[in-house]
């Protein structure tokens, strides 16, 4: 199956550094939260804030390597948001299964009301967070790609050696 002229594997390969960035932010937030650091530091290490940054980085890669167009931006936004929310859900599930609290399952970052198994919290991450994050990231990314194409035209295909690496 091709999406915007490229296979899913090619999208995943292109997004690998952004996946790694999100994984590092997720792990650092978990570690910092376990150490009992101040709340402002937890807010700095936010996977919710890192995901749009990863989408913008993906758009820069898409533009500089001529890796498709707006469809590829939307797919990249979805894949990055899905990865980020899957990491958060894994941390919440770990907390529920082991009984060890972590920053992702504390009440101030959870859905209000009685939910000892965090099912509503997990469901919210898998539905609303992925959906809204994908739409917001795609809108922001498509706007950036539009501006980049108007203001900074990419080099012709034959001049850039990095382009051939991403061809199907």
Regions found by a protein language model. Give the residues of each.
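Juxtamembrane/disordered regions of integral membrane proteins
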Residues: 1-168
């Amino acid at each position: 199956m091709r999406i915007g002229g490229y296979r899913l594997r090619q999208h995943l390969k292109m997004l690998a550094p952004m996946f790694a960035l999100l994984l590092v932010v997720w792990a650092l937030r978990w570690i910092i939260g376990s150490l009992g650091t101040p709340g402002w530091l937890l807010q700095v290490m936010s996977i919710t804030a890192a995901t749009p940054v990863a989408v913008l980085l993906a758009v820069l890669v898409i533009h500089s390597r001529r890796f498709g167009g707006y469809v590829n931006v939307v797919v990249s936004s979805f894949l990055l948001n899905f990865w980020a929310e899957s990491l958060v859900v894994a941390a919440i599930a770990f907390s529920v299964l082991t009984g060890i609290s972590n920053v992702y399952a504390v009440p101030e970052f959870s859905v209000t009301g009685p939910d000892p198994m965090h099912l509503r919290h997990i469901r919210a991450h898998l539905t609303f967070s992925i959906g809204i994050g994908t739409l917001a990231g795609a809108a922001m990314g498509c706007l950036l790609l539009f501006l980049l194409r108007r203001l900074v035209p990419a080099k012709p295909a034959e001049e850039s050696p990095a382009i051939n690496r991403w061809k199907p």
